[in-house]
Curated annotation (Swiss-Prot):
It is an enzyme of class 2 (transferase). It catalyses: a very-long-chain acyl-CoA + malonyl-CoA + H(+) = a very-long-chain 3-oxoacyl-CoA + CO2 + CoA. This is 3-ketoacyl-CoA synthase 1. The gene is KCS1. GO terms for biological process: cellular response to cold; response to cold; response to light stimulus; very long-chain fatty acid biosynthetic process; wax biosynthetic process.
Length: 528
């Protein structure tokens, strides 16, 4: 019977934890865990990663275009193998003018073709994260007091929120918008717009100031906000406020969850490839005011406990002259979408509870769903970034188990050999714990994510940029360093972006950094 229970717990991805209250009593908690991200992968995702890691232009150039053009050159000039041998052994042999001219034209044509078709670099010039005014700060105790005094919650759900808040990993200096902290709460369109304007304009003002770029110079604008989509759109709000140019290409992404920030980066990357000599601005945020839940469905109350106010603005460029002043270049973006599966699609779902109150429900399967999406994303990304030795060891282990059905211990690639820094979406303490365990990361690697969760809470799609800002504020970014951003959110989606530092980022570059004035207080000890 004990063996059967163990199998069932493993199948359902459950973990038992025991805590002792006193000498005579103990508490056993059962919670879901992420799947082992690297021991159960599919060859099709490895194949996808290998395919994406190969540059099509380079392959065509060396395998088709270069040999074909060389053959044509030989036919046109009458060069033979004997002529090449004579040229090699006897430097006195001279080529006629027509042959020299043909060779020169050939080399110029091939070089021009290669340069014209190779991938254009996209630079991250700089970014800014919004830091609300001190009046918007709220401690864990203040949040719980506000929750209890509101009158919308039962005693059971108040206690539930207290348990979650004490274990979530948030500190006492996160931020909530005025509409929620007002007595009584003012959850209306006016307050929601005020929150959106404060966050977006605050981040953009800082970005334009630190980069010296004028709003009129921006040719592409992308805004992502999952749960607040007014008319006119948030992107139109920005265009109007900064009086941007009339031919600006603006996009407003809604409903795409916490992973939408990297979707915006990917969209900007593709648009910059099609629009030379351009600047693109990405604004990632979430709006809390109209999405606070005043019901008693526990699956919807989780969002109240972890989501907080925040946003970020990012400036991208494809102008080669901007390389010297830019901080990073974009190396890879990998997007994984599991929405074809009903369980994945429904695990984060906005709906009405039994009393008609709207909220966002987080299903019990969220941990396993996130793990599966992350596993697929990592398997696809691996061949693009891992050293060849790690790829070979991983593939050999995978083939032995999948094709030959051998019972061998799976080889877990060391992603620390591919990246110096990790920015993992600060969605919650439990997810960070499991990702650290499965990727075998040190506390130092997880520090930006854990400290961001503690200082700012879950700011949705912008959390990755608070983490990058933390890494910079600590003076850890050196030229050539590789940084991995991992985001996951509703749909269910998991997205990765890989950046390479073009220069060291000095701790003196703290203008617009949300950690300015408090970075020396971190890291702090957080709930484990």
């Amino acid at each position: 019977m004990e063996r059967t229970n163990s199998i069932e717990m493993d199948r359902e991805r459950l973990t038992a934890e025991m805590a002792f209250r006193d000498s005579s009593s103990a508490v056993i908690r059962i919670r879901r865990r992420l799947p082992d991200l690297l021991t159960s992968v599919k060859l099709k995702y490895v194949k996808l990663g290998l395919h994406n890691s190969c540059n099509v232009t380079t392959i065509l150039f060396f395998l088709i275009i270069l040999p074909l053009t060389g053959t044509v050159l030989v036919q046109l000039t009458g060069l033979t193998f004997d002529t090449f041998s004579e040229l090699w052994s006897n430097q006195a042999v001279q080529l006629d003018t027509a042959t020299r001219l043909t060779c020169l034209v050939f080399l110029s044509f091939v070089l021009t073709l290669y340069v014209a078709n190779r991938s254009k670099p996209v630079y991250l010039v700089d970014f800014s994260c919004y830091k609300p005014e001190d009046e918007r700060k709220i401690s864990v105790d203040s949040f719980l007091t506000m929750t209890e005094e509101n009158g919308s919650f039962t005693d059971d759900t108040v206690q539930f929120q207290q348990r979650i808040s004490n274990r979530a990993g948030l500190g006492d200096e996160t931020y909530l918008p005025r509409g929620i902290t007002s007595t009584p709460p003012k959850l209306n369109m006016s307050e929601a717009r005020a929150e959106a304007e404060a966050v977006m304009f605050g981040a953009l003002d800082s970005l334009f100031e630190k980069t010296g770029i004028k709003p009129a110079e921006v040719g592409i604008l992308i805004v992502n906000c999952s749960l607040f989509n007014p008319t006119p759109s948030l992107s139109a709000m920005i265009v109007n406020h900064y009086k941007m140019r009339e031919d600006i290409k603006s996009y407003n992404l809604g409903g795409m969850g916490c992973s939408a920030g990297l979707i915006s980066i990917d969209l900007a990357n593709n648009l910059l490839k099609a629009n030379p000599n351009s600047y693109a601005v990405v604004v990632s945020t979430e709006n809390i005011t109209l999405n606070w839940y005043f019901g008693n469905d526990r699956s919807m109350l989780l969002c109240n406990c972890i989501f907080r106010m925040g946003g970020a603005a990012i400036l991208l460029s494809n102008r080669r002259q901007d390389r010297k002043k830019s901080k990073y270049s974009l190396v890879n973006v990998v997007r994984t979408h599991k929405g074809s599966d009903d369980k994945n699609y429904n695990c984060v779902y906005q709906k009405e509870d039994e009393r008609g109150t709207i909220g966002v429900s987080l299903a019990r399967e969220l941990m396993s769903v996130a793990g599966d999406a992350l596993k697929t994303n990592i398997t696809t990304l691996g061949p693009m970034v891992l050293p060849l030795s790690e790829q070979l060891m991983f593939l050999i282990s995978l083939v032995k188990r999948k094709m030959f059905k051998l019972k061998v211990k799976p080889y877990i690639p060391d992603f620390k050999l591919a990246f110096e820094h990790f920015c993992i979406h600060a969605g919650g303490r439990a997810v960070l714990d499991e990702v650290q365990k499965n990727l075998d990361l040190k506390d130092w690697h997880m520090e930006p994510s854990r400290m961001t969760l503690h200082r700012f809470g879950n700011t949705s799609s912008s959390s990755l940029w608070y983490e990058m800002a933390y890494t910079e504020a600590k003076g850890r970014v050196k030229a050539g360093d590789r940084l991995w951003q991992i985001a996951f959110g509703s749909g269910f989606k998991c997205n990765s972006a890989v950046w390479k530092a073009l220069r060291p980022v000095s701790t003196e570059e703290m203008t617009g950094n949300a950690w300015a004035g408090s970075i020396d207080q971190y890291p702090v000890k957080v709930v484990q």
